[in-house]
Amino acid sequence: MDDEAGHLKAAFGDSSDGEDFADRPENRSLGIGDSTVWERVEEINGLWLCRNFLSIHHQSDLLSAILNEGWFVEETINQAMRFGDLPSWATELCDLILETVESVDLSVLPADLLWREPLFDQLIVNLYQPGEGICAHVDLLRFEDGIAIVSLESPCVMRFSPAEADEAEDVDVLLSPGSLILMSGEARYQWKHEINRKENGFQVWQGEEINQKRRISITLRKLCQA
């Protein structure tokens, strides 16, 4: 527990007061208002980024809720998966994503996805130590359209590359702490995504090396019906 508290303090100072993420009333209105800014990644249809999805306080509460699950107590474990009934904080996060998407007059997700219930029912939490990444992949077809990724603690560059060889160039997107990226349509099915650390184990953004520390990502998806 001391290690968890240390990680929280290192990431957010003393902003975490121990209150559960799902219990904070302000979380229920997150994303509603002028502060939410969605950016469409022009090169890839269906790829949207919300850099300010979670405030510092929201990030701290969410990180605390994840660490309290006890998934990463052993250093050899760096991934946790859940299917069906998700933890309350994850269900709340799904609701916040839906609220944020619906709060803007933009086609951030296809309309038919917004009507499905639940929006997401599968969760992956990945813990990346400095220098770690994930190879290029397209998510399995056992999952429906629409994938959400929330980033915590440390920034990283996610690289998108065409799933089939063509003349399209790779596209890099900076995922900052508290950001939300959504993939649907072409972005979900026709582009691979990765966190590439093959060169010296670190990443560079706009000519500057990223100060990479521990990073936690939350991926939300919807299983296809049998």
Model-derived regions, located:
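Non-heme Fe(II) oxygenase metal-center motifs and adjacent flexible, charged/small-residue loops
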Residues: 1-226
